[in-house]
Amino acid sequence: MWYKIRINIAAILLCIGSLCSAQSLSDSAYISLLTCAPGNELYARFGHTALRVCDPVLPIDLTFNYGIFDFNTDHFYWKFVRGETWYELGVTPTWWFMKSYREEHRPVYEQRLNLTAEERDTIWQALRKNYLPENRKYLYNFVYDNCATRPYYLILHVIGDTIHSNYTGYTGLTYRQFIRHYTGAHTWANAGINLLFGSKADQAMSSEQRLFLPEELMLYMNIALRRDWKPMVVQSTATPFVIPSTPWYASWEFGLSIYVLFLVLFSIRDRKRQKWSWGIEVFFGIPYVLLLLIVGFLTFFSCHPLVGFGWRLLIIPITHLCTRLIYIIR
């Protein structure tokens, strides 16, 4: 334990020293886009993006990561629900960054960018400036401003606001369909997200709008061309993500089937007894009313761009009503 603490302290001191002492990168330096495979937690299901700055001459090998957040922030969950979560830029030695993902069995793919010495140094200086205490925090937005969009727009700004890519990927897919792809079509997380998302989530995305997703950014950059029509990436280990499937017993469809079976049995019992069980209505009705209140609150008071009322919210009461018709129809 103490060994790990000493290693971590040494890594932090190394980062601080590198950021403070190095003014300009040498001609041997390179900058890479790092893309991390998805993890098991919901917030990690979409993967992650970071920038690596490596200069063997200075020597420097640091990874800049726009995905740092603090659970201990005052009222963190309240702010997260409202879409008012502040993330920040973090920096670690690359070996430490890689080690943390190896421990989670999550591959990290690297794309070395084709940049001039001036462009590399401009990005390096911009990252150093962004890491200043007064600059490192930003208001996170899952779709428009996250760990993937920040590196992309920084690169875009430095090389001249022009990147051409023939990557089409899943052309025509909507926000909802993409998120279902990463969360798993049959997971409870996807079912919950579907209920919270409104009509805005059903808009088809352009190639650039999809770049908030780390995998899409990785694949987009892999065949991208600079303004001078030279490849944007000169060396790459990029590989499409492998999304694990959901076991049938953990799927929301299985849970819904149990729910319907439960209602059918109660309806048959009520019909035999000639007596309506109001308790079952209360038992299932209160959670649904709470869900409507949550969606209503998020629709009017949340900064999340895709949240809103949608027809999928009607699935629960319609399913409930159709099942209870066993009692009503004689």
What are these regions (language model features)?
Residues D70-D161:
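A cross-kingdom signal targeting lumenal/periplasmic-facing segments of multi-pass membrane
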Residues W2-I5, I9, T116, H186, ...:
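Intrinsic-disorder-associated interaction segments
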